Amino acid sequence: QIQLVQSGPELKKPGETVKISCKASGYTFTNYGMNWVKQAPGKGLRWMGLINTYTGEPTYADDFKDRFAFSLETSASTAFLQINNLKDEDMATYFCARKGIYYDYVWFFDVWGAGTTVTVSS
């Protein structure tokens, strides 16, 4: 079946770097863009941006342009989110989500990972 499997929870100190993986299976990886979504505790979902899985070109939302990097290992059907110089406000659950369906001028994310929780604590 189609699924996105994310790496496990992370505990990091402020200033460190974290890299989260999202492994796709059950479909052709390069046919669908991959989005990243942040959910801080008690907050709603925030779209961070996406990476074109065919060209490798990333697009970042305005608030996620500085310390965040999307990358791919296409041969392993895996997308990555790296966060550098971690801050307290980065403590959240991060989801990968496949860009799947375009309807009525809106893109819908049709397959989601289970999420990776990042805890930032000194």
Can you annotate each of these PLM segments?
Residues Q1-S122:
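Extracellular domains of the immunoglobulin superfamily
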